[in-house]
A protein has these predicted regions:
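Terminal targeting signals and extreme-terminal segments of soluble enzymes
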Residues: 1-76, 82-140
Length: 140
């Protein structure tokens, strides 16, 4: 089951062509990523980073820029999990505007790390279960 989140394209995201500058779209996706942890796993990303010392840095990205994100657009993100490995998680992102137009699609692989050593570690069981509940095609 996918998580759906929304944000607006604001002025600091724009480039000289008056559309979202592509690195800002990755920043937006990361904001959605951080926000998705609470509905998916019941824990906030700051809690994981600061208290549990667990992080999920991106190690692989495949992205299609389909249409521009424009100033004032409301971006609706649909985020689902494609795969949960021993220490990796594959995320699937789809960003649509307020008209339902698909603007951006990305698959991103993250790896669970200990934030002190930055060494890979297995995804903790409580997080694994939450992520598995949001596998693509799984309905609740």
């Amino acid at each position: 089951m996918a998580v759906e989140l929304s944000r607006r394209v604001d002025y600091p995201m724009l480039d000289g062509a008056n559309i979202a500058y592509y690195p800002r779209i990755f920043d937006l996706a990361h904001r959605f990523f951080e926000e998705a942890w609470e509905p998916m796993c019941g824990v906030s990303y700051p809690e994981m980073i600061n208290n549990r010392k667990i992080g999920f840095p991106v190690v692989h990205v495949k992205t299609d820029f389909i249409a521009p994100l424009r100033y004032g657009d409301t971006i609706h993100a649909t985020i689902a999990i494609e795969r949960v490995g021993t220490s990796s998680v594959t995320w699937n992102y789809r960003l649509h505007n307020q008209d339902g137009t698909l603007l951006w699609a990305s698959t991103q692989v993250t790896v669970c790390v200990d934030m002190d050593s930055l060494e890979s570690q297995p995804v903790p069981d409580d997080l694994r279960q939450g992520l598995l509940n949001h596998l693509m095609g799984v309905e609740q």
